[in-house]
Amino acid sequence: MPPANANEYDFIIVGAGSAGCTLANRLSEDARVLVLEVGGWDRDPWIHIPLAWGRMMARRMHDWMYSTEPEPGMNGRRIEIPRGKVIGGSSSINAMAYVRGHRGDYDRWAGSGLTQWSYAHVLPYFRRQECWEGGTDQYRGGDGPLSTRHTTFSDPIVEAFAAAGAAAGYGWTDDFNGRQQEGFARRQVTIRNGRRCSAAVAYLRPALKRANLHIEVGAHVNRVLLDGPRAVGVEYASAGGDTVRAYAGREVILAGGAINSPQLLMLSGIGDPEELRSHGIETKVPLGGVGKNLQDHLSADVGYTRKTPGQFHREMRLDRILIDLAKAYLFGSGFASDVPGGITAFLKTGLDPKLPDIQFLFRAGSLAAQPYLPPFLPSFADTFGCRVALLRPKSRGRISLGSSDPRAPARISLNFLGVEDDLKAIRAGMRMAVDVGRQQPIAPFVGAEMTALKTDAEIDAHVRATGITVYHPIGTCRMGSDSDSVVDPECRVRGVDALRVVDASVMPDLIGGNINAVVIMIAEKAADMIRGRPALAPSNA
C-alpha cells in the first residue's frame, strides 16, 4: 500500500492528448486529478497557426518520431507514424479535420455486443463536445468546448474539383457529420478565431485555474503500480530525472494512444505472458489481446502539375508568407488561418455496398512547398492532388515491446495490405480519383498527371511504393464484451481493478474518417462512466 505521505490524487491520467485533456476537464470538476505528459507545453506558435501543420508534420515537430518495422506489403519500407508529444497530443499537430464517421460504424460496434456505443448512444456526446458554427440542431452541438466550422479556403481549383466530382457522377453532402456522410463536401475543421482549437485549447486550458488539477510535463511513466489485482498508482521519471511514485485513490487512466497505452500495460506486466517473458517482465495479469488488432488508414496520392500558379503557390513567396503567418498568429486572420484544400469526399467503391469505404482528401498545393523568393530562393513546382484513403481495412497489425526499457520505442507492425481485399479497395479508390481528375471542370487547371496511373499493376506498384498512413492508429486495447478484449464496454482493463484505458486504442475497429472527434467523444462518454453519472439520453436522429 502507498505510504501516508505519498503524492495522492483521486485520478491519475497518463497522457495529455485528445482523450487526456477531455478527461482532465471533466474529472477535475469534482475530484483531485494528476495529468502526466511526457511532452512539453503547447506554447510553440507553429502549433496554433493552421497553415503550419504541414511544416510540423514534415519536420516531425513535437513528435514521438515513431516508424514501423519494415512493412512486407509496402516493399519493405518503414512508414512514419507521427504522434503528438506535447500538451494536446496529436490534436496539437494534426490537420484539424473534424470527422465523426458514419452512423453505421457505431451500429456495427453495438452489433458486436457494445450496445451502449451505438450511433444513438454516441451522438449526444458528439453534440456535447462541439461548438458548431451553424449552431445546435439534432446532429450538431452549439455550445461545447471544441470549436468546429467549414474551411474558408478559397481558390477556383477547389470549386473545380467539387464540380469534377459531380461530373463523375458523385453527389454532394452539406454536412457529412449530419444526416448523410456520402458524397463530396466542404471540409470541417477544429479552428477557433483563425487558430487551431486543439483538445488542450478546448478542454485543458479552461480547467487550469482549478487548484485540484495538477499537470506535470516532461513526465515519462515507467509502469502502473499494482497492489494485487488493483491499480494503485504509477511510477514515472520526472523532467528532472527523479523517479517518482504517485498514487490514485480511485483510478488510474491510461490515455497515451494506440501505441503508448498497450506498451505501458505490457511494461506493467499486463499482456501476453509469452511476450512479457521474452523481455524478462513478470506477468501480473495475463491478457493476450494487448497490442493486437492495430489498424490505420492507408493512403496514396494522385498528383498533377498546375497550369497556372494558384493562391497557395502565390502566398508561399517569402515576403507574403511571413506577413500571412504573423497575421494568423497575432490576429487569427488571413491566408495562414485556414488549411488549403477545402474539399473532402466519402465514396463507395462498390466493394462494400453499405458504407463509403474510400475518402478523398483534396490538396490545392504542393507537398514539397517551401517559402521562395527569386532569385535568392528558387520556387517549387506548383502542383495539386487528391489523397485516397482506405477507410475500413481488413488487415490487422500489432504493437509489441522492443525492450523492457520504458524509454525504448515499441515495435510497430501495421501489416498494410496483408489482406488482398484491402489492395482491391484502394485500387478501386485510386481509379475513382484518376477519373475525377480527368473530368472537364478540372481540365483547365491540369498541366500533367504526375502519377499517370493506367493499369492495375501501375496502381498497385504506386500504392506499395508511396503509400503512407493518415495517422489514425487504433484498436490495440480493443473494447469488447468478449473475454478476448482488453477493456470492457466501460473501458475497464479486464482482470485489473481501478485501471482504465480511454483513447483511440479501445476502438474495436476503424471508423470511416479522421479520428480526433471520435477520441474526444470516447473520453466524454467515459468521463460519465468513471464518475458514475447517467449516460446522456440516446438520440433518435
Which residues does each PLM region occupy?
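A glycine-rich dinucleotide-binding beta-alpha-beta segment and adjacent secondary-structure elements
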Residues: 51-52, 67, 184-187, 191-192, ...
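Glycine-rich loop(s) and the adjacent beta-strand/alpha-helix scaffold that form part
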Residues: 32-33, 39-42, 224, 233-324, ...
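N-terminal glycine-rich phosphate/pyrophosphate-binding loop and immediately adjacent elements
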Residues: 2-127, 286-287, 297-306
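FAD cofactor-binding and catalytic pocket of flavoenzymes
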Residues: 303-423, 469-473, 501-504, 508
